[in-house]
A protein has these predicted regions:
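Conserved blade-ending motifs and adjacent loop-strand segments that build the rim/top face
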Residues: 97-100, 135-157
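Flexible internal linker/loop segments at domain or repeat junctions
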Residues: 70-102
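Loop/turn-rich, solvent-exposed surfaces of beta-rich toroidal or solenoidal domains
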Residues: 92-133
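Sequence/structural signature of beta-propeller modules
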Residues: 3-4, 12-42, 57-58
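Structural motif
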Residues: 43-46, 52-59, 64-76, 122-129
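Short hydrophobic alpha-helix segments
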Residues: 59-61, 89, 95, 139-140
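Structural signature of eukaryotic scaffold interfaces centered on beta-propeller domains
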Residues: 32-39, 49, 100-110, 152-157
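Residue-level signal for glycine
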Residues: 53-55, 83, 89, 133-136
Length: 157
């Protein structure tokens, strides 16, 4: 009886350690810096309301031209500067981050790469600077996450 209890206790401790390390690894993953977003990836804004995440595409990124093209609805809230290279996009308080997302489909696996861009801004104003400079509101952070892999048949839906 004592051996079984001891084994269960050790198993629980190991599970807690693994979960803790996994969570910490996920947080630290946000410090990785890939070269740049993928060609034609969609720039997304993230809005969290009542604990549910909602996304809205605000534009696309062209890796060859190193430019971010914003769609019409996003441009309603964005104003180009005199140089034409910078945009100022005022964010609602509920949209703290921008997302660059790109998905690829293999033979049997579906892989989605999420590039998280967090800007350091004053107030709720985010400056989208020409991406040749690699800066966004002073700093740019890209994180890669691998979405859940599913079978090719489910990915074709």
């Amino acid at each position: 009886m004592k051996k079984a209890f001891g084994a269960i206790l050790i198993a629980v401790i190991l599970i807690i350690c693994v979960v803790t390390l996994t969570v910490q690894r996920g947080e630290n993953a946000m410090l990785e810096f890939p070269e740049r977003p993928a060609e034609g990836c969609t720039v997304m804004s993230l809005e969290i309301t009542d604990g549910k995440a909602q996304t809205e595409a605000i534009g696309t990124y062209n890796v060859n031209e190193n430019v971010l093209t914003m769609n019409t609805s996003a441009l309603e809230n964005a104003e180009p500067t005199e140089s034409g290279e910078n945009y100022t996009y005022t964010l609602p308080e509920s949209i703290p981050n921008f997302y660059f997302s790109d998905t690829t489909q293999g033979l049997l696996l579906y892989k989605g790469y999420l590039y998280v861009v967090t800007a350091t801004t004053s107030g709720q104003t985010l400056e989208i600077i020409n991406l040749k400079t690699g800066t966004l509101g002073g700093k740019i952070y890209y994180s890669q996450f691998l979405k859940e892999q599913i079978s090719g048949s489910a990915a074709s839906e």
